[in-house]
Amino acid sequence: MDTSHKVYNFECPFELAKVEMKAISNTMHKVDDFVSTIDVNFSDSELDDKVDDLEIKIEKVSGPLLNRYLGSVGKVVFLIFSFLFFGSIKLVLKCFYHLFKCVFCNPLTRCFCSIIFTIIFYTLLFVSCYLLWHYFGDVIIQTIKDINNNRSVNFTNETENFNSKVETTTMKIIQLIFSKSDNNGVEHIIKSANVTSGQTANFTLLNG
């Protein structure tokens, strides 16, 4: 006879409930410990320690590779960049964490949302820097070259060049948004007159 399974005979439902509660008491105790753990607020020092641990792990993995391909100078540059980057991450993460105290009571939810919003913040920051470099990078490079070649740079001309670049880029964006083609394939583009002091800009849709 197989005795690996015990057979219980219960006279009433209360006896069954008593056995079930006894069986799950250990599991419920573990759940209570877990809930008490995630309900503990993170201090600023604990958040710093978690980000520092992540920084140390990344440096351990990338350090030998950088030293091999870029040498000691490249490794030092990376360490400086890592210090500044993770330092700013800690600052933004703590700002969001304390900001969400007014919204979320659960510290785990607050920490998760802080991480998500930190990622979104840096994504928007990098996209903005890319768009700035994409549209105005040549003007910035030319200005830096002029400063390096001649210390007495005419900033009036540089400002005019920058304003011209802004005007051209703005027109491209407006044409991209508002230009369209009719059924005959004729493209409608935006024409604008030169704007001088005291005049207004008139944008009119005309046949190209």
Swiss-Prot record:
Top-level lineage group: Viruses
InterPro entries, alphabetized: Fijivirus_P9-2 (IPR009650)
UniProt cross-references to Pfam families, sorted A to Z: Fijivirus_P9-2
Protein name: Uncharacterized protein VP9-2
Organism: Fiji disease virus (isolate Sugarcane) (FDV)
Protein encoded by which gene: S9
